[in-house]
Design a protein with these regions (language model features):
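Conserved "repeat-terminator" motif of extracellular CCP/Sushi domains
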Residues: 1-4, 95-104, 326-335
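Beta-rich interaction/scaffold domains
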Residues: 268-341
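Short, surface-exposed beta-strand/beta-hairpin micro-motifs centered on an aromatic residue
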Residues: 45, 52-59, 176-179
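Asparagine-centered strand-capping/turn motif at beta-strand->loop junctions
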Residues: 372, 382-386
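Short, ordered, surface-exposed loop/turn motifs in non-cytosolic proteins
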Residues: 16-43, 122-126, 354
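A short, solvent-exposed beta-strand micro-motif common in secreted/extracellular proteins
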Residues: 61-74, 187-193, 307
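Intrinsic-disorder/low-complexity signal
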Residues: 91-268
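A short, amphipathic beta-strand motif
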Residues: 7-16, 108-112, 341-345
Length: 413
């Protein structure tokens, strides 16, 4: 019958910059055939602002169509963007689509979309942008754990250069990454299959995700990339963008990036080492406020200054590796004395409890139980992880020779 020769489409239009349903009017131009953006328009549909991005297209003859979303008025000012859809007899196709508003002419936007749960697509694909830093050596890297790259400027304060505007962890997208302020150099854009990161032979991103990346500049749709099929791996290198020439170059390859590689996606060996050194520096800096002001701490600060200089300026990978090892030893040294074996007050064993620094999971003090007056000489025996005595230190309560500050109170418990 007539109904068997037609099908329906239900659209949900979301704003690529927020991930929310659009609250402005747009227009749809429907053309016959896939990837057809210049032929005769079969049907035009207005989607009102009050529709919250919802639109039903009913009783379309079976076949393939291209639907182009365009601005309805000056308020919407969106970048015209097409997508293809196949109408199946007697069925209603549900389709989410991301709409991007016109951005500045010197801004670049990458929008990722992929399949839904029913399609068997991976639930979580992640967008990664690697690009040149404004200051210092190396590249910045924006992704779900470090969404914004910004630098401090004396006149303007913190300036945002790139941002993962929208992060989606449960199918479809959109995930949106924008270069807000360009720096001379090459930007590399990747998609990482977080769902299948442990499976080197997985083809889920390649064959099941249906992932598409659209690239915009200003009011122009520059490129549309589809993930290559039949490829094993968890990392899709989509494209490179040269900010000097303004050219987007298709890379479009899928390969494997090691498990737990989210923080290092797209980095060279040198960049991975610098990233590791920066994280070690951050780890040690976190201990600064729980350490006593003594020779040990002063030496640690000297080493940290050397490490920061290497991270910013050195091209010698052996020096960076050696510094990473040195900082790891400092961290182990601090943590190894976190277990207290026993406490003596004026030569007598006493009951005590630890005072922990919850932010860093270390002990930074003790409380002696049942003390009502000012304590005298204390002895604290630390042990290492194998419970062998590490060191016994005898010090007046006001002393500052401990690696960690030991605080003694007269609290009665």
């Amino acid at each position: 019958g007539e109904d068997d020769a037609t099908g329906n489409i239900e659209l949900t239009l979301v704003d690529a910059a927020t991930g929310d349903a659009i609250d402005y009017a747009v227009a749809l131009e429907i053309r016959e055939g896939a990837n057809n953006v210049s032929g005769n328009i079969l049907k035009e549909i207005a989607v009102e602002a009050s529709a919250n991005g919802k639109c039903a297209i009913e009783e379309l003859p079976i076949g393939s169509y291209t639907i182009q979303v365009v601005s309805a008025d000056e308020k919407s000012e969106i970048v015209a963007a097409p997508f293809s859809v196949t109408v199946i007899a007697g069925q209603t196709i549900t389709k989410p689509f991301s709409v991007t508003k016109i951005i500045n002419d010197d801004q670049i936007r990458f929008v990722l979309r992929w399949g839904d749960e029913e399609s068997g697509a991976p639930s979580d694909l992640d967008s990664h942008l690697v690009g040149p830093r404004v200051k210092g050596i190396g590249n910045f890297h924006t992704y779900y754990s470090d969404k914004t790259y910004e630098e401090y400027d004396d006149e303007d304060g913190y300036v945002k250069y790139a941002d993962l505007d929208v992060d989606d962890v449960s199918w479809e997208g959109p995930e949106t990454t924008t270069i807000y302020k360009q720096t001379a150099g090459t930007y590399r854009f990747y998609i990482y299959d977080f769902s299948d990161q442990e499976d080197e032979e997985s083809k889920n991103m390649s064959d099941k995700s249906g992932a598409i990346v659209t690239v915009y500049r200003g009011s122009t749709l520059l490129n549309t990339f589809s993930v290559p099929t039949g490829q094993s791996g968890n990392l899709w290198h989509v494209c490179d963008y040269d900010s000097v020439t303004g050219r987007v170059t298709s890379i479009n390859t899928v390969g494997y990036w090691p498990n737990d590689g989210s923080s290092t996606v797209g980095m060279s060996e040198a960049e991975v080492l610098r990233d590791s050194l920066s994280r070690k520096i951050s780890d040690i800096q976190d201990y600064d406020f729980v350490l006593a002001d003594n020779a040990y701490k002063a030496n640690m600060k000297t080493v940290l200054a050397e490490a920061e200089n290497l991270a910013d300026n050195s091209e010698n990978m052996d020096d960076i590796r050696a510094m990473i090892q040195k900082l790891e030893e400092i961290k182990n040294d601090i943590q190894s004395v976190g277990t207290i074996g026993n406490v003596k007050l004026d030569g007598e064993y006493v009951d005590w409890e630890t005072i922990g620094d919850e932010d860093h999971y270390i002990v930074n003090g003790i409380r002696i139980m049942g003390v009502n007056n000012t304590p005298g000489e204390i002895e604290v025996a630390f042990t290492n992880t194998s419970d062998d005595p590490l060191e016994v230190r005898s010090e007046d309560v006001s002393g500052q020779d401990y690696i960690k500050v030991i605080t003694v109170t007269n609290t009665v418990s």
